[in-house]
């Protein structure tokens, strides 16, 4: 075994790429490390494509092993199970920039598996996973237009920071990941604290500039360790068939794409395609219909793009910077804590907000450590939203990714736990879809949060931008339709407030997207965002003054931290009795903060009263109503507060001489007692006769 190793400095860390020792039966295997965070990336591709396949079957599997962090998995089986949300998101992060770098017409199955085998808790494994994937594909021999670079960019104290540590990210106003080739940005994923457009654009340019060192190093690594490139050539098109299809279908497709209603348009496109196939089959019964479908798809793309470049109206008749008609409704569901229905053209989201206590927060235990999410956002895309049938069940990768993008868009305006001590779950049900459903979810979430009384800092809106570029000519499109997303060159989603951007996601399919084009897209998106915010604010301009009557109300009180154990009780008996008997939820924190949650105000008051009783100090000279709990020869023990007992000596029972305690007191008898003394050991001395004397004097 002769390892080939390439090391280089990248930001604050040393990156090492190694091949030739591990997983040698794969087409390529790279052990990539950044500091102590190490991933094993393997690539395997089939030498032949399966017959009849009309798509590129690329699979990216990202898996985090708990041994990488020196942990043993929880659960009964004590081994890793289905991918977590974080693993799914990182798999998508790797997939998105590499997919457009495979050549058109390449249909061979390719599988990339990234395994995290060692992790430094200060170095996220996503960037080194992207770098390792780029290196493995570069040396595999599989047709791939790499290398690809990747960088994380932070923004701290007005300065960009390359690949910030986890600790630095905690103070950063920006968490942006950018990936690209030597000449082009291909993918951006980010979360920001309402930063200006120029700062966001600058971070993309900065990250792309910095990752050139990665691209150069991988090119050198490939020169030393790369396998011969596969002998693969793209399938050639039948020029005569292309001409026939153009003659038969171009005019019909052009007319079909003037129909503004999506379902009607699709129906007419199907009619045109069916007529074209029928005509071709009549002249050549053995024609390959799969090839015809592919060529019709290419013609369809050319027709739509040509209209846009020529300055003609878009598919639905709009100008490039126009937003579809908006409908905004808040408070549409009677029993939810907050709700909204946001409609933009043929895209619609029904969004609900549910408030809960801290114990409802999501607890996440990953290889990067434990964390708690008080704000959750779940996105559902049922098949009926696009007029189709399909499976309904656990969320797919796309749904998880779209939900996280919407979460990033909103998270910057969420209140702190001190400002709003609730856990918040938002669910976005996409009820109609024709482009930009994730950004509709951002708008709907902002509205539903306000309807629920969540004190978010300001409204947030999202917009999806598109691009059509032919040579030096280009058109930036606002509020793209699903067809424009599919047929265009860029999907550019921006969420933010009036003051700045909170989330930016870009997926670019071509090279040649300049800084100028991205700047135009950002400025056009700003205008669209403000327009949407104006409409949203007419429906609900600020959060409700109070939360829903159906939501649990959390009351916060403070107790002496030393009294926490008294509230909990032995084996949790006291707090269990409190919650069961009052019907409330009670949470205790180490600093003495007590949170009582209930939708019943009287139950909350009763819980507070009982907690105050338990935690109150015995006051010397005060009269308490107590209960006799034990009788002894020399007196009786009386409970005056939960967990607080005192002794009434036989001489303090009555002014008269008492020979037998049982003649004057009995178990469970309620008596008034006065606290005479609390000694150094906390023992309480009580008196019944002094209490009676004080009560008699007060009556007189």
From Swiss-Prot:
It is an enzyme of class 2 (transferase). GO terms for biological process: mRNA catabolic process; RNA processing. Gene3D superfamilies: GHMP Kinase, N-terminal domain (3.30.230.70), K Homology domain, type 1 (3.30.1370.10), Nucleic acid-binding proteins (2.40.50.140). Its EC number is 2.7.7.8. One of its GO terms (molecular function) is 3'-5'-RNA exonuclease activity. Residues 621-689 form the S1 motif domain. GO terms for cellular component: cytosol. Its cofactor is Mg(2+). The keyword Lipoprotein does not apply. Mg(2+) binds at residues 485, 491. It catalyses: RNA(n+1) + phosphate = RNA(n) + a ribonucleoside 5'-diphosphate. It is found in: Cytoplasm. Its main location: cytoplasm. Keywords: Cytoplasm, Magnesium, Metal-binding, Nucleotidyltransferase, RNA-binding, Transferase. Residues 552-611 form the KH domain. HAMAP family: PNPase. Belongs to the polyribonucleotide nucleotidyltransferase family. Involved in mRNA degradation. Catalyzes the phosphorolysis of single-stranded polyribonucleotides processively in the 3'- to 5'-direction. Component of the RNA degradosome, which is a multiprotein complex involved in RNA processing and mRNA degradation. This is Polyribonucleotide nucleotidyltransferase. It comes from Shewanella baltica (strain OS155 / ATCC BAA-1091).
